[in-house]
């Protein structure tokens, strides 16, 4: 369900940059179909971006999220980060953001499947936690889910578009009026 981005100058299409952006994001929001309005829930996540972008999340054995996913597994996801440069700027900008959005299909992972352990490890790694073999029995009491998003259904955007993976972390602000060369911004704005 890809829609063209209006502000294409801010679009990030390089897969390595998208992964680096996701690496800096801690929370993902899942939009699930409900009436009269979508049900949006924040979750921590892990991911793998091979042919498709696959997000992994965990949850309890019951709840609203699971009831709604049983009715309609088609979801949207958003992960984002934002910084405000108080008293300064970067390349003439007073703030910066990174966002990744996608549509996909959610599916529960069988606890006996090989993918369950992989998903568990990716989830832990993304959240800066260490895999402990003694946690495996505990993991059998929660659910792990995957959201599979086709690569063409993934969009990413930034206020100051990074050109390299090293530029993905937010740059430190410089005091206003320090004479930065901002001519590239004026050219982009046309």
Residue ranges and their predicted role:
Residues 1-23, 170-179:
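Extreme N-terminal tail/first-helix region
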């Amino acid at each position: 369900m890809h829609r063209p981005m209006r502000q294409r100058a801010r679009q990030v299409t390089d897969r390595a940059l998208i992964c680096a952006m996701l690496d800096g994001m801690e929370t993902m929001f899942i939009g699930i179909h409900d009436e009269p309005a979508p049900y949006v829930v924040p979750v921590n996540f892990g991911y793998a971006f091979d042919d498709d972008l696959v997000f992994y999340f965990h949850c309890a054995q019951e709840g609203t999220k699971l009831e709604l996913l049983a009715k309609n597994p088609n979801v949207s996801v958003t992960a984002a980060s934002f910084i405000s440069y108080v008293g300064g700027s970067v390349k003439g900008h007073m703030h910066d953001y990174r966002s990744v959005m996608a549509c996909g299909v959610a599916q529960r992972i069988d606890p006996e499947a090989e993918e369950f352990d992989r998903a568990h490890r990716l989830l832990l790694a993304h959240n800066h936690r260490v895999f402990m073999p003694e946690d495996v029995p505990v993991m059998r009491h929660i659910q792990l889910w995957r959201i599979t998003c086709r690569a063409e259904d993934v969009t990413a955007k930034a206020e100051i578009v990074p050109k390299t993976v090293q530029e993905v972390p937010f740059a430190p602000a410089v005091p206003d009026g320090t004479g930065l060369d901002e001519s590239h911004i004026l050219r982009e704005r046309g």
